[in-house]
Amino acid sequence: MSREGGIRGCDIDRAVMELGDFKLIVVSDGEFRLDGGAMFGVVPRTLWEKEKPPDERNRIRMGTNCLLVERGGDLLLIDTGIGDKHDARFLDNYALAGATRLPESIRQAGYELEDVTHVLLSQLHFDHCGWNTRRDGDRAVPTFPKARYWLQSGEVEHGRHPNERDRASYFPLNWEPLFEAGVVELFTEEAEPIPGVKAVRTPGHNSDMCIVLIDGGESRQGVFWADLVPTAAHVPYPWIMSYDLYPLTTLENKKRWLPRAAEGGWLCVFEHDPEVPFGRLVEDKPGRYRAVPVETPVAA
């Protein structure tokens, strides 16, 4: 991890990797900004600002790195970004500059929205599921008309009955139209929408967030960290977001998964890093890990 301006990686949009028979393509919904102090919890600003320099409102850059996973006739999308259903105040608060672009990114990668066969959600916070649906006049409809959407059942229940601490993170318009359209598959602890791609419930950020494991065979493994490790700078065990409802559970799960990822040489996807979509973990000292960016080509 660089101490001068943070980790640097490749261009985000349409970064592509092969993992066994899987083709993995990052498709971005653009950038937004969140408060740097909230993103790094108890870590002092004097440390985190070296990795993620804040703007004049103390906000840091955040990516929306969704992942297309292709094999055979299956095209699975992990998470769907922020979407297009927000007002001017929301756009200003999160420095969204007016428009997000996941559908465009998917098309630029060589696919149509109709090509997506499965959508797998790590959670239902607004920055992970916004393009589940799109505007169609005065209503919202599924963005991916031929896809089944895989949602964790406890997260749906919590999204319908949020508490005061996280109510602002949930927008039912991002998932209720999916139920109306009859395109939802619910799961509890694990789900494998296509062979080799498995969502695993991993609480900490909230009660029911999931990471996604990708098994490319012959020891070629990948992991989509979602908000367990939102950026490459969040790899160290104590670097945990203040947004996490259960930070000690986050810590336990980092201690469970990061050693496995480092020892196995797993390909890691950092959903919210605006510069490092793909990386691997190395252990510098016992229990001390850091991310090493993986340079990638760009999908045509």
Please name every model-derived segment:
Residues M1-A15:
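N-terminal amphipathic/basic-hydrophobic helices that include classical n-h-c signal peptides
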Residues D13-Q108, I211-L228:
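Conserved beta-strand hairpin/beta-sheet module of binuclear metal-dependent hydrolase folds
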Residues D29-G30, T80-G83, L124, G154-E155, ...:
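Active-site metal-binding loops of divalent metal-dependent hydrolases
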Residues L76-I78, L120, Y149, G222-F224, ...:
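Residue-level marker for buried hydrophobic side chains located in beta-strands
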Residues N93-E104, L213-A300:
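Cap/insert and terminal regions of metallo-dependent hydrolase folds
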Residues A97-Y111, D115-D127, T143-R201, N206, ...:
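Metallo-beta-lactamase
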Residues C129-R139, R280-V282:
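Metal-dependent catalytic neighborhoods of phosphoester/phosphodiester hydrolases
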